[in-house]
Regions:
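C-terminal cap/substrate-recognition subdomain and adjoining C-terminal extension
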Residues: 1-121
Length: 121
């Protein structure tokens, strides 16, 4: 995947990471895949006086992933990569969708729709 994202970034593709995992984990991982921190859409925790609160800001999961993409990305994605049904709405926005190591439900949908399915070794 690192080689793929390196090639995409090198050819001028704008890379984004969209996840329902917390933003500090996704930002760290995204850096390894050539995704700038400003192009990470992930769960944010509200911070008050330097302390994390119990309030979450923007939780991009299911349809909220698609909503965040429509709101924050300058254009709809050419390609989308996902591994679960929580990614379905996001994958439906992409011109080309890829199911990467998908769970059973997403793999079934991907095959029905003719999307690429990839199971890494």
């Amino acid at each position: 995947m690192q080689e793929l994202t390196r090639r995409l970034a090198g050819s001028g593709c704008e890379l984004w990471a969209v996840s329902s995992t917390n933003d500090w984990v996704i930002r760290a991982a995204a850096a390894r895949f050539h995704v700038p921190p400003t192009q990470v859409l992930a769960v944010c925790v509200d911070v008050n006086d330097g302390h994390c609160t119990d309030r979450l800001i923007r939780v991009p999961t299911d349809e909220l992933k698609a909503s965040a993409i429509r709101e924050l990305m300058p254009r709809m994605p050419d390609a989308g990569f996902g591994n679960s049904m929580h990614d379905l709405a996001m994958l439906e926005l992409a011109r080309r969708a890829f199911a990467i190591n998908p769970n059973h439900d997403l793999e079934e949908v991907a095959r029905q729709r003719g999307w690429e399915v990839y199971h890494p070794d």
